[in-house]
A protein has these predicted regions:
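Bacterial N-terminal signal peptides that target proteins for export
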Residues: 1-7
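Short, surface-exposed beta-strand segments enriched in small/polar/acidic residues
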Residues: 51-84, 105-114
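Periplasmic OmpA/Pal-like peptidoglycan-binding modules at the C-termini of bacterial envelope proteins
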Residues: 21-26, 31-34, 38-40, 54, ...
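Short, conserved glycine- and acidic-residue-centered signature motifs
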Residues: 44-47, 79-87, 124
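Cysteine-centered nucleophilic/redox motifs
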Residues: 51, 66, 82-97, 131
Length: 134
């Protein structure tokens, strides 16, 4: 039992940075844009309503953080391009919804990448963009 508790605590400590906000502020709200195909940077159509709803609150915030994750496929350079493209497309969408440009920050990509998934279904979950506000 003690080993299990220690193991769970260690896992939490290891995984915590992956879930931390890379823009450095306390989160008051968060949403996740999911459904990206491999290599796709365009926001999936079924996610735009959810993102627009988030933008309604985000318009009144001073800190918006956008950071993208990718799956294990592709080279580091390709994954960085895809993650940057996803984050930038979400940023542009938020701007189109009236969120102030100076409030939006793109999180550092190396802090946002987490590759927990081993199965193909897990890798689908890894292809996402987190959007948070203070």
């Amino acid at each position: 039992m003690i080993r299990q508790v220690i193991g769970a605590a260690a896992l939490i400590l290891i995984a915590a940075p992956a879930f931390a906000n890379p823009c450095g502020f306390d989160e008051r709200g968060r949403m996740v844009v999911t459904g990206y195909a491999v290599g796709q940077t365009t926001i999936p159509g079924d996610q735009k309503a959810k993102l627009a709803e988030f933008a309604e609150t985000a318009k009144f915030r001073t800190g918006i953080c956008v950071f993208a994750q990718v799956d294990k496929q592709g080279s580091d350079a390709a994954n960085e391009r895809v993650a940057s493209g996803r984050a930038e497309n979400v940023r542009q969408y938020l701007l189109s919804q009236g969120v102030k440009a100076d409030a939006i920050r793109i999180g550092k990509q190396e802090e946002a990448f987490t590759f927990f998934g081993l199965l193909s279904s897990d890798q689908e979950d890894d292809r996402r963009v987190f959007v948070t506000h203070n």
